[in-house]
Amino acid sequence: MSNKDELYTFGIGENFHLQNYLGVHSENESFCFRVWAPNAENVQVIGDFTDWRNRPLQMNKNQAGVWEANSLDAREGDLYKYLVTRKGGQVVEKIDPMAVYMERRPGTASVIKVLRNKKWEDGLWMGRRKRLGFQKRPINIYEVHAGSWKKDDFGHPMTFSQLKDYLIPYLVEMNYTHVEFMPLMAHPLDMSWGYQLMGYFAFEHTYGTPEEFQDFVEACHKNNIGVLVDWVPGHFIQNDDALAYFDGTATYEYQNHDRAHNYRWGALNFDLGKNQVQSFLISSALFWIEHYHIDGIRVDAVSNMLYLDYDEGPWEANQFGDNRNLEGYYFLRKLNKVIKERHPNVMMIAEESTASTPITKDLESGGLGFDFKWNMGWMNDILRFYEEDPLYRQYDFNLVTFSFMYIFNENFVLAFSHDEVVHGKKSMMHKMWGDRYNQFAGLRNLYAYQMCHPGKKLLFMGSEFGQFLEWKYNDQLEWENLNDDMNQKMQRYTKQLNQFYKDHKCLWRIDDSFDGIEIIDADNKSETVLSFIRKDDKGDLLLCVFNMTPVERPNFTIGVPQAGIYEEVLNTEMEEFGGVWKNHNPVTKTQVATWKDYDHTLSFTLPALGASVWRIKRRLRK
């Protein structure tokens, strides 16, 4: 586009590659700087090439509020900032909102960097992604905080060049299908989760270079691993040298003070109704998708964008007298529309905790158009249940079965995320009831239930081997736990469970309707046993039975819809996984008998605090 077109589309919220105009760009022998600061009194460029404030480079402002200047002295790798004079004469140093790289901390300057036009070698993956999509594919996500998965030999976070050599082989070995990273965009603290961003186009310096991350994604794709990233379009850090009140007025944030300030997180909320902010944010999302070939974006804190009263501070009702943030609603619909028009096979996932807005319904039906939503209700209920003493679980059996009431209202991801293993909530293993043996047994049972329940899967790093302590973002995982036999067996179990999930289409082919599940018995409160069948579109099935008390049940009998010879294909209490069973249940033939609405029954021994999954080895005539 011409500069005139760039400015016009920026102003109407339709410039979706804003980084091609704003920011710093190499032009012949010079670098051109452009920044949007419509209400600034003056803006200058300062940096290594101006001896900082000694020889500031004056910028000129156009009618759209964009300031521009060219420098023959600037070089790639130079540090720079914008020196912004606000109304009233206050002068502040600001980062470049469009910078693609930032100075290593404690510095906060932007870096002049020309991004390479990578020759990608992941064509097979990208072609398969386009051809097969993802809705009817296995999705099992390993959630990672890049700074604390594993440290290097000097105790520093690994760069993506190092993670390529360590994390990717681990993902392959553990049979995950995708990896999801907590924010990789520039943020101001090394020791943080990364959710208060300062650079929406800048790759976080701690983790290496943009080129290293491109190579990491390419290597993942060559190993059949998809890559997802977390993205935070609702709020941003309130540091004075970043986006906050950029030109002295509400530039990126709301004009209204209470709407602008996020009291819960000590941040500022984007004005999602402002056209220029929409151009900025949608450009950021597309930049990560297109420049880094990522396979999906998880949008953080969607509830904060949808409801005016979600925060802890004061709020005012909208023009209809209710609590809906209409700007947030329309922005999210626009975001998904734009991305799906350009990249229909990139996943859009919402972290959203309410049930009043249709998150994954299509735009034509009034939904937000996301592909998936984290199932926060299921996660809270099921963790509460598994923490409870089994003696009382029969009285709270609805915590396990309630999800069947809304299971297909949305397309869900069943997530045990980083949020569940911090702030005194305990690690996944430590949440489980009982002594150490029963905690591991409970965790194996829980993970089997997650895999068999309809919905895509996510597990936070360290939970796969039963790390005992909570996640510490300033340290690496407790890899030393793997010196313990029980942790080794837990890791082996997760590895085999992940492969089991991939191998059985019944567990992922139909995740969005009751065509993929048949509830056998959700009323067995007294024994606290849940059973259902998962089905695919070819007629195959798996019988899934979960014993949620530490009582072995010999000759357990259950009705089945198909006569046949059944084979146990998963038993969470096998010795190799840390249990006590040396052998599987024997291959078993159904009996002709009435059991509820079924004409055939299957009898077997149900392991204590265990899950037992069966497949039909040979069908018999009824």
Swiss-Prot record:
The keyword Transferase applies. CDD domains: AmyAc_Glg_BE (cd11322), E_set_GBE_prok_N (cd02855). GO terms for cellular component: cytosol. Pathway: Glycan biosynthesis; glycogen biosynthesis. Keywords: Carbohydrate metabolism, Glycogen biosynthesis, Glycogen metabolism, Glycosyltransferase, Transferase. It holds the Pfam family Alpha-amylase. Gene3D superfamilies: Glycosidases, Golgi alpha-mannosidase II, Immunoglobulins. It catalyses: Transfers a segment of a (1->4)-alpha-D-glucan chain to a primary hydroxy group in a similar glucan chain. The active site is at D300 (nucleophile), E351 (proton donor). Disulfide bonds: none annotated. One of its GO terms (molecular function) is cation binding. Its EC number is 2.4.1.18. GO terms for biological process: glycogen biosynthetic process. HAMAP family: GlgB. PANTHER family: 1,4-ALPHA-GLUCAN-BRANCHING ENZYME (PTHR43651:SF3). Belongs to the glycosyl hydrolase 13 family. GlgB subfamily. Monomer. This is 1,4-alpha-glucan branching enzyme GlgB.
